[in-house]
């Protein structure tokens, strides 16, 4: 299928390096070339040159939901705006964020500047991928202002091979810092296998019924979490429900999910166990130790402290004028990804990957004092 652009009601999407720190958008000057269109369907352009034609129907079904959602929103008494730039499904598409200062909107980072928690006890979820979508969008840690862009792998835009059935995103001001090492001890493996986090903000899923908007900041209630080992890295997933869902008041735990959205949890776990099979030919591993609400909130706060520690480590390293670059993981300590995966699956009776949940007990091991933070990650 050839490339075709659809522009719903126009909108100014020229690539003017819109997340340059000098770029401010006036909310009073209506003739400014950066004048912002409030409704998403007047801003979004779509390139229909998809790898999978099923994506097209999903995109259009989502557009119908977007049209009445304002791109200007208030969170914790602060006014924010998100803006779509260029054409979705192209390399130069990105979502940028702004905060209102006096009469202007100034660029901000969704990772650094959006609050993690709200006054009512909810947490803020930054939506990267909407329900039923294939396009793998992600906060870009190494780009200025950490804009959201489509992820790339081997130089090509990345897509899920199967659409995701939940709204997926990240928690601001959290970080799975590879400086911290975790271990798995079991009867099967007498020696401890060591793992580190995946060097990204903490992932979160909304199990609510609605398709949220790409880039939207949504208050959610935490329900639980699970530990995923994805190609040898720890990758925790927080499970939540958005505040506007019709069952928000009814669902307060993982067990409540089954009452109102039957089979959601088992489908969710199976999806994350198998979604990389088309690429890696291997199943991910999920620990049978599911987190309850309190344990999940403790995990969120731990990764928030990791985020603060990372910011402090970056500051110290810059002050020392060091030019050292990141050690992706200290594999002298953390061993080897392939080795860890093979060891976890070394069972004479039955391969671990035949089970939905595995007997993997992940506990904290230690902090690597020699670890250097990645100075390529953008910080204010």
Curated annotation (Swiss-Prot):
Its cofactor is Mg(2+). Mg(2+) 2 binds at residue 203. Coiled coil: none annotated. One of its GO terms (biological process) is phosphate-containing compound metabolic process. Belongs to the PPase family. It catalyses: diphosphate + H2O = 2 phosphate + H(+). It comes from Plasmodium falciparum (isolate 3D7). This is Probable inorganic pyrophosphatase. It comes from the Eukaryota. Gene3D superfamilies: Inorganic pyrophosphatase. Its EC number is 3.6.1.1. InterPro entries: Pyrophosphatase, Pyrophosphatase_sf. It is an enzyme of class 3 (hydrolase). Mg(2+) 1 binds at residues 198, 203, 235. PANTHER family: INORGANIC PYROPHOSPHATASE. One of its GO terms (molecular function) is inorganic diphosphate phosphatase activity. Keywords: Hydrolase, Magnesium, Metal-binding. GO terms for cellular component: cytoplasm.
């Amino acid at each position: 299928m050839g490339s075709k652009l659809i522009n719903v009601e126009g909108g100014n999407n020229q690539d003017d390096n819109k997340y340059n720190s000098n770029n401010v958008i006036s909310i009073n000057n209506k003739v400014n070339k950066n004048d912002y269109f409030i409704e998403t369907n007047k801003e979004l352009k779509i390139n229909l040159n998809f790898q999978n034609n099923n994506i097209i129907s999903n995109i259009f079904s989502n557009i119908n939901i977007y049209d009445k959602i304002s791109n200007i929103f208030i969170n914790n008494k602060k006014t924010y705006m998100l803006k779509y730039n260029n054409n979705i499904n192209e390399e130069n598409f990105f979502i940028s964020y702004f905060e209102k200062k006096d009469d202007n909107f100034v660029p901000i980072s969704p990772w650094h500047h959006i609050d993690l928690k709200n006054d009512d006890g909810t947490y803020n979820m930054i939506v990267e991928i909407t329900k039923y979508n294939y396009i793998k969008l992600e906060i870009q840690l190494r780009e200025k202002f950490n804009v959201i862009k489509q992820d790339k792998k081997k130089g090509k835009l990345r897509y899920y091979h199967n659409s995701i059935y939940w709204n997926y995103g990240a928690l601001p001001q959290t970080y799975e810092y590879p400086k911290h090492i975790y271990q798995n001890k079991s009867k099967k493996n007498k020696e401890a296998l060591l793992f580190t986090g995946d060097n990204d903000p903490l992932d979160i899923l909304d199990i609510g019924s609605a398709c949220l908007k790409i880039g939207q900041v949504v208050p959610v209630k935490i329900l639980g979490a699970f530990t995923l080992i994805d190609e040898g890295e720890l990758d925790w997933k927080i499970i939540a429900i958005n505040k506007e869902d019709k069952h928000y008041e009814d669902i307060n735990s993982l067990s409540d999910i089954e009452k109102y959205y039957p089979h959601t949890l088992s489908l969710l776990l199976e999806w994350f166990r198998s979604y990389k099979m088309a690429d890696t030919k291997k199943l991910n591993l999920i620990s049978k130790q599911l987190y309850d609400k309190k344990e999940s909130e403790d995990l969120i706060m731990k990764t928030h402290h990791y985020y603060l520690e990372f910011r402090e480590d970056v500051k110290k390293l810059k002050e020392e004028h060091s030019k050292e670059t990141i050690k992706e993981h200290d594999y002298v300590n953390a061993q080897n990804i392939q080795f860890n995966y093979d060891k976890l699956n070394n069972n004479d009776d039955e391969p671990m990957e035949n089970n939905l949940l595995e007997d993997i007990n992940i506990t904290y091991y230690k902090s690597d004092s020699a670890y250097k933070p990645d100075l390529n990650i953008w910080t204010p």
